[in-house]
């Protein structure tokens, strides 16, 4: 018996539509201009709403996809409408504040997360290492805060502790505080796809493993969104 199975760090997530993606890209561009060492939202750092992050056995990924698909069919995600309500500083990375757009939690999201946790438990493992993540020449290491965050995602970020959000970049704490205090007009939007992604450093959704578009219209929207990353 293998007591140290190969693991993959995954993120089951929602890809939002172009309305909120446009806002996320605008904020990210501003943050990058003021802090070039931050991360740019692109196809390797997509704007998304994380529902569940955890380690699963790599050999069970196909079973994970089937389990996620089963939950998708049981929830009315196709009619889901969400509201982005504010921009906040949500923790820090290397002494820089993390800027996120907060989404109002709704019952469907909470149910979706709860069912995902239950159905994926047989495939989950603890004590994941950097080998479970996507790395690159530009970002070759996985920091300890990422490893800790994913390890503790379920107790710290599920149920009553779940704060749906879209991470849009990082910036110095003092200047970010000024940005989050600016007026934020609420935005109504919908998800266009549900995906299982492999995580990169700092919880970025780096590599799509499996994706389900919500409708034919959503497929076209998703394609247009991905084109917008390279503009």
For every predicted segment, state its role.
Residues 101-102:
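A short, structured beta-strand-centered segment in the mid-to-C-terminal lobe
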Residues 93-97:
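Acidic/polar active-site rim loop that often engages polyanionic ligands
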Residues 1-92, 106-195, 201-231:
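Basic, often amphipathic N-terminal segments
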């Amino acid at each position: 018996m293998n007591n140290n199975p190969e693991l993959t760090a995954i993120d089951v997530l929602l890809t939002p539509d172009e309305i909120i993606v446009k806002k996320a890209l605008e904020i990210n561009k501003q943050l990058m201009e003021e802090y070039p060492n931050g991360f740019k939202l692109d196809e390797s750092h997509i704007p998304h709403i994380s529902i569940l992050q955890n380690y699963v056995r790599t050999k069970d990924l196909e079973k994970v996809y089937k389990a996620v698909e089963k939950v998708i069919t049981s929830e009315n995600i196709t009619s889901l409408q969400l509201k982005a309500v504010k921009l906040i500083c949500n923790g820090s990375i290397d002494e820089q504040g993390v800027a996120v757009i907060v989404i109002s939690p709704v019952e469907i999201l909470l149910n979706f997360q709860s069912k995902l946790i239950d159905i994926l438990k047989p495939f989950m493992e603890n004590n994941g290492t950097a080998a479970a993540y996507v790395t690159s020449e530009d970002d070759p290491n996985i920091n300890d805060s990422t490893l800790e965050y994913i390890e503790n995602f379920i107790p710290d970020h599920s149920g009553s502790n779940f704060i749906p959000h879209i991470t849009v970049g990082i910036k110095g704490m003092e200047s970010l505080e000024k940005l989050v205090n600016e007026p934020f007009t609420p935005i109504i939007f919908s998800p266009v796809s549900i995906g299982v992604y492999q995580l990169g450093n700092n919880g970025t959704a780096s590599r799509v493993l499996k994706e389900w578009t919500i409708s034919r219209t959503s497929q076209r929207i998703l394609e247009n969104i991905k084109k917008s990353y390279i503009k």
